[in-house]
């Protein structure tokens, strides 16, 4: 039986895998370029949107880094994040854990302080004005060196109270988690939470490295773990949450169609899967669109969607009190 759209909308949502730079809508890209006196290689908003029709991860990343170049000032980052929070609140997202890529900004001469201050201002406003709580996760670009990641971490540590953890993203193949074992150990010593993208395009061994060498608290993507039975059993035994991104997987050809997506199989095996939007402006949908699309394609029922939300609450880095509050909101939905 199809899930009632009213239930889908009313369902409280928790997003654990959202790149704030990936929420840059074409309209905002054009507006920020104008505000900052920058020339885009596109004649219109429609031309930008047409460029969002890419075929693979690398083509997407090339466009993603080009797009983020319009982000220059503290106000730009605040506006970007507030636009995301407003969309999230409209879809009944209660809590979001947001990646940001400082190296993509500092390499362009943008001060790290401006990035963090703008995002933090938006987070405070979102909680006060919209009731959306959030955390920031500083993400290292894996195509760069570990030395550069160390430098970014050291530069960010004076702002330690503004971000809860570190992550690892960008081009996966050829950049295994092992490359960043020392910087993750340093982050762990600072009391930061640890997450990493692994097993999206990279092999199951990358997931194993993220567990063994990075000692992650949460696994981002993780789809290819399903190719390794021993790894599946380990993830279940350890209660490791996976931040799964269905529309992202479809757009980047990780799956050929959503009917072949492994999300339902993950749930049925007992994996702690969650639904997330990843880079929603590029991949065609925020939390509600991801849930609706995968619910239809995989014939999910309301109990599956409740489980996905409960998993996300449990796997979040929110306080115990906030988690209890969100579980109560979930239980109240009929």
Swiss-Prot record:
Reactions catalysed according to its record: adenine + H2O + H(+) = hypoxanthine + NH4(+)
Cofactor(s) needed: Zn(2+)
Domain of life: Bacteria
Keyword Metal-binding in annotation: yes
Ligand binding (Zn(2+)): 17, 19, 197, 278
EC number: 3.5.4.2
Protein name: Adenine deaminase
GO molecular function: adenine deaminase activity; zinc ion binding
Swiss-Prot/TrEMBL site (Important for catalytic activity) positions: 221
Binding site for substrate: 279
């Amino acid at each position: 039986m199809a899930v009632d759209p009213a239930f889908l909308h009313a369902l409280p949502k928790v997003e654990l895998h959202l790149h704030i730079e990936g929420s840059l809508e074409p309209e905002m890209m054009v507006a920020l370029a104008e505000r900052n006196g920058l020339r885009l290689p596109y004649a219109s908003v429609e031309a930008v949107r047409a460029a969002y029709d890419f075929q693979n991860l690398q083509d997407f990343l090339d466009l993603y880094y080009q797009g983020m170049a319009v982000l220059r000032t503290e106000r730009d980052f605040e506006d970007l994040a507030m636009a995301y929070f407003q969309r999230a609140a409209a879809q009944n997202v209660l809590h979001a854990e947001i990646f940001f890529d400082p190296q993509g900004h500092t390499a362009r001469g943008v001060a790290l302080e401006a990035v963090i201050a703008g995002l933090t201002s938006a987070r405070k406003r979102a909680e006060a004005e919209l009731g959306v709580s959030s955390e920031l996760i500083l993400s290292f670009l894996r195509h760069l060196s570990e030395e550069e990641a160390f430098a970014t971490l050291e530069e960010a540590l004076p702002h330690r109270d503004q971000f809860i953890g570190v992550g690892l993203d960008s081009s996966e193949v050829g950049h295994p988690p092992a490359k960043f074992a020392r910087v993750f150990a340093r982050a762990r010593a600072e009391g930061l939470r640890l997450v990493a993208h692994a097993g999206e395009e990279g092999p199951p061994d990358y997931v194993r490295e993220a567990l063994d060498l990075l000692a992650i608290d949460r696994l981002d993507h993780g789809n290819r773990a399903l190719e390794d039975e021993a790894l599946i059993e380990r993830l279940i035994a350890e209660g490791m949450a996976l931040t799964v991104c269905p529309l992202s997987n479809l757009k980047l050809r990780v799956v050929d169609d959503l009917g072949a997506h492994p999300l339902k199989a993950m749930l049925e095996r007992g994996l702690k899967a969650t639904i997330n939007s990843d880079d929603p402006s590029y991949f065609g949908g925020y939390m509600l669109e991801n849930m609706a699309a995968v619910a239809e394609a995989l014939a999910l029922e309301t109990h599956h969607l409740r489980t996905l939300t409960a998993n996300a609450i449990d796997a979040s880095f929110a306080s115990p009190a906030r988690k209890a509050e969100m579980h109560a909101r979930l239980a109240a939905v009929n």
